[in-house]
Design a protein with these regions (language model features):
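Membrane-embedded alpha-helical bundles of polytopic integral membrane proteins
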Residues: 1-220
Length: 221
């Protein structure tokens, strides 16, 4: 399980990072679009559709993303959209935690399918908008998620249910523990200090570099 996670992460990083640091935002936008299309195809398979139906689900997700791109939404704040989307996400997650796996089965299949495609579309739009805000901002968000997941995974395996007797969400994911939550939280706190210090050092180093370069240029003149 761990080896598969590592291999998958390395392959994705080899594709994602060059696109992320490319001067133009187009390659990164297309890479993320391909990932979301694959996710929509898989969502179609999980929803019980065959190959053709799942491809249609992926095409619908690509169409939504492409329309948003063509309309220029990747450069617009879209405050109302994010408020509604975020609110529905929180309410839906709270309901699923309460209802558990049996509650998921009570949702109509068509509604589950549409909700999944919309979630993938919003995820694409959010990530692409974050890239337009700057590489440093988006990279900090991605690393935060990676660190939280890694620390939670190892903390859960090492200390799961040693200090608390109640699992995190047994009705949804029986293997998750509160020790994993605290481990992920600790990892994020450490990352915050390290990232802030590194960011401050980098921002200070760049003006210093250009100052020295200007001084040398003045001396040569």
């Amino acid at each position: 399980m761990l080896l598969q996670r590592v291999i998958t992460a390395l392959v994705l990083l080899a594709i994602l990072l060059p696109a992320l640091f490319y001067p133009s935002t187009v390659p990164f936008t297309l890479v993320v679009l391909a990932l979301m299309a694959a996710g929509a195809w898989e969502w179609g398979r999980l929803s019980g559709y065959g190959q053709a139906g799942s491809l249609a689900v992926g095409a619908a997700c690509v169409a939504l993303c492409g329309a948003s791109w063509a309309l220029g939404w990747i450069d617009q704040p879209l405050t109302a959209l994010w408020i509604v989307g975020g609110g529905l996400w929180v309410l839906g997650a709270a309901w699923l935690l309460h209802a558990g796996v049996p509650g998921w089965a009570r949702i109509p299949a068509a509604l589950r399918l549409v909700a999944g495609v919309l979630a993938l579309w919003l995820a694409w739009l959010a990530v692409v908008q974050a890239r337009h805000l700057g590489v440093n901002f988006l990279l900090s968000v991605l690393v935060l998620v990676w660190v939280a997941d890694i620390f939670a995974y190892f903390a859960g395996r090492a200390f799961g249910l040693r200090f608390t007797k109640n699992k995190l969400a047994p009705s949804i994911s029986p293997g998750k523990s509160w020790e994993g939550v605290w481990g992920g939280l600790a990892g994020v706190v450490v990352l915050a200090f390290v990232w802030t210090a590194a960011d401050a050092h980098w921002q200070a180093a760049v003006p210093s570099f250009y100052s020295r370069l200007a001084q040398q240029g003045g001396w040569l003149l």
